[in-house]
Regions:
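Cap/lid segment of the alpha/beta-hydrolase catalytic domain
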Residues: 103-127, 190
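Alpha/beta-hydrolase active-site loop
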Residues: 120-143, 164
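Short beta-strand/loop motif that positions the catalytic acidic residue
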Residues: 227-229, 233
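Active-site glycine-rich loops that stabilize anionic/oxyanionic intermediates
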Residues: 74-78
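A domain-start/cap signature at the N-terminus of enzymes
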Residues: 1-68, 80-86, 94-98, 147, ...
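Short beta-strand immediately N-terminal to the catalytic nucleophile in serine-hydrolase-like folds
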Residues: 152-154, 179, 228
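A conserved short beta-strand
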Residues: 172-183
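Short glycine-enriched nucleophile-adjacent loop
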Residues: 159-171
Length: 266
């Protein structure tokens, strides 16, 4: 209980900082110049066992067989706030692909966090994971999505949920980008979630890899993974990025050393 109490105290101390970050992201570079993206809610997309909401952005003049990006918001955010903060809709308009934004509900989590640490919501064909899968199926049927070009990305809790979807449904995705997230299977309850976020308590790379391999019993090609994490992140410890990389290196039996190294701007 002492560990849980310390974690809760840390959460309370960081709440103000985190909310300021989210508000700044939602406002964008300037409230005078930010364009509010056009989102429409799709209410009927399946049995929705995870009780999530589905929002979609469809560019004008959408062509045949467009790509699809699934964008998962972080805690305290909404689909619309995440759309404004990330600019995904602007990119979709320029390049002609569809974006869907699953949205958490306070009845599931009072902070609007996706339930990446709840086994009933992270298993294949169960809970929130199945709801997101059903949203993808709805988008494929309604917008004629090219099923070879389905991608997923998410921030923080959304990044952790992107890890869930890539592990539970690897055959669905061409690739995914995990931003400030955590490895699949890194927590199965609230205490373990806090430990993974703040204390870097993590299973071995082999154990993490085994959890991905056993999630769907997948034998086909694995999706490509891109991992991003800010070094100043005070909500999710940046070392989680290394654990995600180690997990997927182990899953795909890759060498630890990169085949090519490119330095970008910071």
């Amino acid at each position: 209980m002492a560990g849980l109490r310390a974690s809760l105290d840390s959460l309370r101390q960081m709440r103000g900082l985190f909310q300021k970050r989210i508000a700044a992201a939602s406002r964008g570079p300037s409230s005078a110049t930010t364009t509010i993206p056009s989102l429409r809610e799709i209410a009927a997309f399946g049995s929705n066992p995870g009780n999530l909401r589905m929002f979609a952005h469809v560019p004008p003049g959408l062509g045949e067989k467009p790509a699809l990006v699934v964008a998962l918001h972080g805690c305290t955010q909404s689909a619309r706030a995440y759309a404004v903060g990330t600019g995904w809709c602007d990119v979709a308009d320029r390049h002609g692909f569809v974006v869907i934004y699953p949205e958490q509900q306070p009845s599931n989590n009072p902070k609007n966090c996706f339930s990446w640490f709840v086994p009933a919501d992270t298993a294949r064909d169960s809970g929130e994971a199945l709801s997101i899968r059903q949203m993808i199926e709805k988008a494929v049927s309604e917008f004629g999505i090219d099923q070879r070009r389905i991608f997923i990305t998410g921030l923080s809790a959304g990044g952790a949920m992107a890890s869930v979807m890539l592990a539970a449904y690897p055959e669905v995705f061409a690739g995914g980008a995990i931003i400030g997230g955590l490895p699949y299977g890194s927590a199965s309850n609230v205490q373990e979630a806090f430990d993974a976020m703040f204390n870097d308590r993590m299973p071995s790379a082999r154990a993490l890899g085994d959890r991905v391999r056993s999630a769907p019993k997948h034998e086909g090609r694995w999706p490509r993974i891109s991992v991003w994490h800010g070094t100043a992140d005070a909500v999710v410890k940046p070392s989680n990025a290394e654990h995600i990389v180690s997990q997927w290196i182990h899953v795909q039996s890759l060498q630890r050393e990169p085949s090519e190294l490119k330095h970008g701007a910071r």
